[in-house]
Amino acid sequence: MYRTSRINNAPVVASQHDYDRDQIKRELNSLRRNVHDLCTRSGTSFDCNKFLRSDDMTPVVTTITPKRTADYKITEYVGDVKTIKPSNRPLVESGPLVREAAKYGECIV
């Protein structure tokens, strides 16, 4: 049900701290139980298991918008001479990442 580490018995390394491996496991399991309780007690129809597995995420769409570089200057070096000239070549920028949230209405978790 839950993803487990591929490395069994991996040491916990943290500077200036000595963590008890069993205590970390107990706290992690307690956190999982608490998240599950919160999801099942809520009045929404949100599927907690899909949230924990993260397998129901809709793909992220990246939009690309062309932009003209009329205001940008290109600097060229020829020997020791620096030349600056305007350019009108298009730049490609990636727009903001957009996630579709139609399944749960306007609620994005």
From Swiss-Prot:
It holds the Pfam family DUF2576. InterPro entries: AcMNPV_Orf5 (IPR022556). This is Uncharacterized 12.4 kDa protein in CTL-LEF2 intergenic region. It comes from Autographa californica nuclear polyhedrosis virus. The lineage of its organism: Viruses, Viruses incertae sedis, Naldaviricetes, Lefavirales, Baculoviridae.
